[in-house]
Amino acid sequence: MKVRPSVRRICEKCRVIRRHGRVMVICSSNPKHKQRQG
């Protein structure tokens, strides 16, 4: 999980979602693409 000031999709499979008021990126193809804004 990377924590970044601005998150964006890295590949086509990445999905931008909101959980508990936080913007996150989850990816089904590559778990290294997981990101959280903060």
From Swiss-Prot:
Keywords: Ribonucleoprotein, Ribosomal protein. One of its GO terms (cellular component) is ribosome. InterPro entries: Ribosomal_bL36 (IPR000473), Ribosomal_bL36_sp (IPR035977). Signal peptide: none annotated. GO terms for molecular function: structural constituent of ribosome. SUPFAM superfamilies: Ribosomal protein L36 (SSF57840). The keyword Ribonucleoprotein applies. One of its GO terms (biological process) is translation. Pfam families: Ribosomal_L36 (PF00444). It comes from the Bacteria. Belongs to the bacterial ribosomal protein bL36 family. NCBIfam families: rpmJ_bact (TIGR01022). This is Large ribosomal subunit protein bL36. It comes from Synechococcus sp. (strain JA-2-3B'a(2-13)). The lineage of its organism: Bacteria, Bacillati, Cyanobacteriota, Cyanophyceae, Synechococcales.
